[in-house]
A protein has these predicted regions:
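A general structural signal for well-ordered alpha-helical segments in protein cores
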Residues: 1-2, 19, 36, 53, ...
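N-terminal basic/disordered segments at the start of proteins
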Residues: 1-13, 20-22, 77-83
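Glycine-rich anion-binding loops and their surrounding alpha/beta cores
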Residues: 7, 62-65, 87, 102, ...
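N-terminal glycine-rich anion-binding loops that anchor highly charged ligand groups
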Residues: 8-54, 62-69, 288-289
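Helix N-cap / loop-to-helix initiation motif
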Residues: 15, 32-33, 49, 91, ...
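Beta-strand segments within the central parallel beta-sheet cores of soluble alpha/beta enzyme folds
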Residues: 38, 54-57, 72, 136-140, ...
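A glycine-rich phosphate/pyrophosphate-binding beta-strand-loop-alpha-helix module
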Residues: 40, 88-144
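Active-site cofactor/substrate anionic-group-binding motifs, chiefly glycine-
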Residues: 47-113
């Protein structure tokens, strides 16, 4: 690890094989916490390359559990985090809207690492059992159309890295690896990233890893979501081709909002925000859920265009059925415990 650390601190890029080797040492706990934190920080300062991300992702996936579904018509819906926006859990909240609209969701997530609340924190606050085994997740998806794969359960080697990430408290390559290492190998994904420069990097990585349909997004405010404070950069993957465009809320009848309008808190606070949206609240928080849910509905194949998906998202929320989906999911996960 010292040799690889030296190379990175000198500004040199690692090969795919070297990156995989570094990831192996971090996950297995053969590198000391001091070396791991130094390596993660140095890699972030240098800037992670496509080869480094692919190498680390492949090693991480090789050590994790897996979920096998009978179809590939399902999505993962996740943000990298690390954007410093302190927003509520937008992608996790949006997954319930997608599921209520008929999209099968196999979501991969974790507890908060560089924010107050991660996907696990919100789902737990909504009453779900977040510690299902692979077979139980498969059953949950078959029964409810959605499932949650806890990174700490599926990537058990992460136990050696989790405390280090929490202690240094900054965005690292692990923020990128989570969305890329879905145990179900989802070929349809909506991924929010923390930097406009990383949008094209993610698109290249995902294309190389065989993702068929995806939207990789970053707001003009740096949010790892489709934002309501301005426009959002999108790289859409369509069968290996990458199409670049922007999403402007104004084009869908949605007014710009301030960042303060979409801030969140811990898991319990964010659960209350989600419930308010699902129970009919009209606000910037609802608007951002509409825009992000639409991405999942579109990539999940339930709409022929993003514009059509926005209308479906609005109708789904207004129907009142999303809260039923939350309760159904929570009950099923508890039954499987």
């Amino acid at each position: 690890m010292k040799e690889l650390l030296k190379k990175v601190t000198e500004g040199q890029n690692l090969t795919r094989e070297e990156a995989a080797k570094a990831m192996d040492m971090m996950l297995e706990g053969t590198a000391s916490p001091v070396l791991v934190s130094a390596f993660l920080t140095a890699l972030r300062m240098k800037g992670e390359t496509v080869d480094e991300i692919v190498g680390c992702t492949e090693m991480m996936k090789s050590k994790g559990g897996s979920v096998k579904l009978d179809t590939d018509e399902y999505i993962d819906f996740v943000g990298t985090g690390g954007d410093g926006a302190n927003s509520f859990n937008i992608s996790t909240t949006s997954m319930f809207v997608c599921a209520a609209a008929g999209v099968t969701v196999a979501k991969h997530g974790n507890r908060a690492a560089s924010s107050k609340s991660g996907a696990s924190d919100l789902l737990e606050a909504l009453g779900a059992n977040i510690m299902l085994e692979p077979k139980q997740v498969e059953q949950c998806i078959n029964e409810t159309g959605m499932g949650f794969m806890n990174a700490m359960k599926f990537h058990k080697a992460m136990k050696n890295v989790g405390p280090i990430r929490k202690e240094i408290g900054i965005r690292t390559i692990f923020n990128m690896l989570g969305p890329l290492s879905n145990p179900s190998n989802a070929s349809r994904q909506v991924i929010g990233v923390f930097s406009p420069e990383k949008v094209s990097v993610f698109a290249k990585v995902m294309s190389e890893m065989g993702v068929k349909r995806a939207m990789i997004v970053c707001g003009s405010d740096g949010m790892d979501e489709i934002t309501v404070t301005g426009k959002t950069l999108v790289n859409e993957i369509i069968d290996g081709k990458i199409v670049v465009y922007e999403i402007d809320p104004h084009d869908y009848g949605i007014e710009y909002a301030d960042a303060s309008d979409i801030t969140g808190g811990d898991g319990k606070e964010n659960a209350e925000i989600a419930k308010s949206i699902f129970n009919g609240e009209k606000s910037a928080r609802r608007d951002i859920i509409v825009l992000n849910s639409a991405a999942g509905i579109y990539i999940g194949g339930k709409a022929d265009s993003y514009k059509e998906a926005v209308e479906i998202a609005k109708q789904t929320i207004d129907s009142g059925n999303v809260m039923d989906k939350v309760n159904e999911f929570a009950a099923e996960t508890k039954k499987l415990n």
